[in-house]
Regions:
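TPR-adjacent "capping" and linker segments in tetratricopeptide-repeat scaffold/adaptor proteins
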Residues: 1-11
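Conserved alpha-helical positions within TPR/SEL1-like repeat arrays
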Residues: 12-20, 43-54, 77-88, 111-122, ...
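Canonical positions in the second alpha-helix
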Residues: 34, 68, 102, 136, ...
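Short coil turns that delineate tetratricopeptide repeat
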Residues: 39, 73, 107, 141, ...
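TPR/TPR-like (Sel1-like) alpha-helical repeat modules
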Residues: 386, 400-422
Length: 422
């Protein structure tokens, strides 16, 4: 063996040792020396690429994998590694092509099938992802990660019971697999098995103190109407991640249910600040303003109530301007407008009331257009058309009056029909 080969072998050994110790910058130095000594060494390019990938230098890693493949176009690991780098850059279709090639060259590598499944999963091609996870498990029946990933794909297809079986297997193979406990908790939550879900979230938190597990445990407690406990979990989620917009939103919901409206509004405003394009917070603040208006109406504080109702409308308008395809916010705005219309009717401002009721109808029709099973919107339409018939009885023809009454009854019947399905 000549001096050059001895030096190459030494740099390879040092590079492997550095890689094992996760000293990736040193890895790059060692394999760069190999490449300087032998620029046709495909393994050196591949290994340097791996180090760069671990440093999240994905584009540079791809350049090294390209070179490795150029030197050896049957280098299955280089295709696989390049696929991983492209996956991390969210170039999923390109990643799949590399995984395809890696599998063509070596179809016995369970990890490649798993990772190709991950790319298909992220493209929402869940059925295809499951096929890849199936193959990964066929090749390695103890592959806990593949069971977990297959469970996630089934969960996205709303196959919750099947997903749980996969999570069970993942946990059987690795009883410290925090993600599998967390994911199983989510499936049990979706099956409304809230107490069981909490047990899984407890285990996930014990193993990995994650903000998501606290947030989702809070959701389960919320649905059990244990609002104070839910708030404690949301507090912890926010402590771990103070930019967790959904945790603020969920905490706001719990506080709203405890009638702690000012605190709830503060949380909803924070969720809006963090996610300005998410309209859920706008809808909830509008709803709270409407609830507060109802309280003021009972106290006969009409001006204050009207002010709150108009503030609510402003929030709904902001939300709709951001996202115009959400049925709930149209329904909410219609409900609040109905309150204002009733206010005008009770003051005998009939023309104003009629104009407002017609705006309400537009909102409820839009809510139904976006969700044709929106029972509350149908019920509200019936309520308004019945009012319009009554307050206009002396101004419209008998035919128009009867038509409004008929439409009102049809809307009530439709609402009842939909509610009976629940």
């Amino acid at each position: 063996m000549n001096d050059k080969n001895i030096k190459i072998d030494r740099e390879f050994d040092l590079g492997y040792q550095a890689y094992q110790n996760k000293k990736y910058k040193e890895v790059i130095k060692h394999f760069s020396k190999v490449i300087k000594l032998d620029n046709n060494n495909s393994a050196a390019y591949n290994n340097r690429g791996l180090a760069k990938e671990n440093l999240q230098q994905y584009e540079e890693a791809i350049e090294d994998y390209d070179k490795a493949i150029e030197l050896d176009n049957d280098y299955s690991n280089a295709y696989y590694n390049r696929g991983n780098a492209k996956y991390n850059l969210q170039r999923y279709e390109e990643a799949i092509k590399d995984y395809d090639k890696a599998i063509e060259l070596d179809n016995n590598n369970s990890i490649v099938y798993n990772n190709r499944g991950n790319a298909k999963y992220d493209l929402e091609r869940y059925e295809e992802a499951i096929e890849d996870y199936d193959k990964a498990i066929e090749l390695d029946s103890n592959y806990s990660v593949a069971y977990n990933n297959r469970g996630l794909a089934k969960w996205n297809l709303q196959q919750y019971k099947e997903a749980i079986k996969d999570y069970d297997k993942a946990i059987e193979l690795d009883n410290n697999y925090s993600d599998a406990y967390y994911n199983r908790g989510n499936s049990k939550y979706d099956l409304e098995r809230y107490e069981e879900a909490i047990e899984d979230f407890n285990k996930a938190i014990e193993l990995d103190n994650s903000s998501d597990a606290y947030n989702n445990r809070g959701l389960a407690k919320y649905d059990l109407q244990r609002y104070e406990e839910a708030i404690e979990d949301y507090n912890k989620a926010i402590e771990l991640d103070n930019n967790y917009s959904m945790a603020y939103y969920n905490r706001g919901l719990a506080k709203k249910n405890l009638q702690r409206y000012k605190e709830a509004i503060k949380d909803f405003n924070k969720s809006i600040e963090l996610e300005p394009n998410d309209i859920l917070g706008y809808n909830q603040i509008g709803f709270i303003k409407t609830k507060q208006a109802n309280i003021e109406l009972k106290k006969l504080n009409y001006d204050k109530a009207l002010g709150l109702l108009n503030e609510a409308i402003e929030y709904y308008d902001k939300g709709i301007k951001i996202k115009s395809d959400n049925s709930e916010i149209y329904d909410s705005r219609g409900y609040t407008r109905t309150k204002i219309a009733n206010f005008e009717r009770d003051k005998n401002n009939i023309d104003n009331a009629i104009k407002l009721y017609k705006e309400c109808i537009e909102d409820f029709n839009k809510a139904i257009e976006l969700n044709n099973e929106h029972a509350l919107a149908y019920n509200s339409l019936g309520y308004i058309k019945n009012i319009l018939a009554n307050i206009q009885k002396d101004k419209i023809s008998e035919e128009d009056y009867n038509q409004l009454k008929k439409e009102a009854l049809d809307n009530f019947n439709k609402a009842y029909e939909l509610l009976m399905k629940i």
